[in-house]
Amino acid sequence: SYAHALRYIAQFVPLYLATSLSMQQARRKLGKALFSLFEGGVFADGGLLVYAGQNRCMPVELLLDINEESAKITAHSYEGQVYKYSMLVYDKEERINILSRLKEKPYQVFYKPPLITVIHKDVDKRKGVLHICKALAFPLDQVLVVGNSLKDWEMMSVVSHSCAVMNAEPLLKERARYTLNPDRLAAFFRFRE
């Protein structure tokens, strides 16, 4: 399983998570035991970076003109700064209305009905990975980035070692240098000893 794979890899190299989830969502999804294997990460597509006891939060302006009766809004924050908004909007007309108003703002907006997500306009996973690698002096030719979605390719392509998980989108598996098979992990990761 991937949980066993992560536990195994964490014995040899530092792990960092890169996800579109907020840090709180990632902690809930992975569970405390798995989340604690990561030394930090890129959260909310780069809205929050956590590494080596430091953080960089890219705040998002307050959403003032959204009717909270028509949208369930969750503000994801770190030390009092909101770095991601998630909105569940079930009414199609209201979604269209909200999306048109958000396009006028300096945000990145992601939309997958009924969910609308808002983050800072200047962040992404690629920039987050590059920032952490530079801050921690990780040579890019010694970094492995694992992804499961074609949206991860931009982040994966900046390092020498890219890896798709077994159930990744087929095009990502074609582009990635490796495919991660958790059943073969012990042989795969011995290069770091």
Residues covered by each model-derived region:
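Hydrophobic packing residues within well-ordered alpha-helices of enzyme cores
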Residues: 26-30, 98, 155, 172
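Asp-based, Mg2+/Mn2+-dependent phosphohydrolase catalytic module
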Residues: 158, 162-193
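Conserved acidic, metal-coordinating active-site core of Asp-based
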Residues: 67-158, 167
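Active-site phosphate-binding/coordination module
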Residues: 2-76
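Short, well-ordered alpha-helix to beta-strand connector turns
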Residues: 12-13, 38, 45, 82-83, ...
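Conserved Rossmann-like nucleotide-cofactor binding loop
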Residues: 23, 151, 170
